[in-house]
Amino acid sequence: GLGDVYKRQLFAYWIPKTLKNIDICTIPEDHNPGVSNAFMYGGFLCGILSLICELAKGFIPVYLGQKYLDINSMLFVPVLVAPVFGHAFPFLQKEKGGKAITASFGVLLGLFPELHPAVYLAFFFIFFSVVVIINPHSLRSILTFGFFAFNVLLTIKTASIQIGCFIIAVIVIYSCLLYTSD
């Protein structure tokens, strides 16, 4: 339905393409249709609109999903994973998927009031960007999502959230490896 179409939209690709006639997949070395490239090559407006849309892509289905599904049920796992998977692997579209980092943050924020997973992800991104600086960005993202998943598995008691976060980490790590092999 409409949700399937929405989660597969690469807003960070389409917004700069529509507003500035820029294909952000052809300019940067990583060819990633991500929010950081929308900011860098499309400017502030393209970047902020992309950020809002990509966060919403993950937030809306998870936030609404927990209103109608029991988050303790394994049926909640696909609700967590679908926006990230749809961004990383946008079937039936000519564009290559993105790393799904921003969509992952949206999913985790959608777990409100349970924000520990989102805080873990933000903490490790900041830690590996400011305290122990890891470059290139793809390696930073791989380590961040690895530590994020490990901490969720250790501290979050809800199995569906543990499994969903683990699968999200695997998807993003795989996507980062795809982009570094280009």
Describe each PLM feature range.
Residues 34, 39-66:
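Multi-pass membrane catalytic core of lipid/isoprenoid biosynthesis enzymes
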